[in-house]
Amino acid sequence: MYKPLPDSLIIQSSGINGQGLFAKQNIPAQENLGITHIKLGEKIIRTPLGGFINHSDNPNCTKSHTFVTNHNDSKIKYDYKQWNLFTIKNIKKGEELTLEYTFYKI
């Protein structure tokens, strides 16, 4: 079953800008929270996880990208790049998750 956000997160009003992602429970450092963006060819798809995280110069999350390919299957060949959101600090229940915006510097 598709879930736009992990069970540990909720979207709420943010003091930073509009709405943001907040922890519903304590989240440990180095936790993979899921996919924020996928790049297929020249198209970039942003997930709800990527759409609601706000910028901070002192973030508690980072993103990591992976290149995914399936050139071994002669019937369906694909490749894409995906970005996942990881916590870099322990995050307390109620704390907003933030990221240093560098996505468009790619």
Language-model-derived ranges and their functions:
Residues M1-I106:
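Conserved catalytic SET/PR domain of SAM-dependent protein methyltransferases, capturing the structural core
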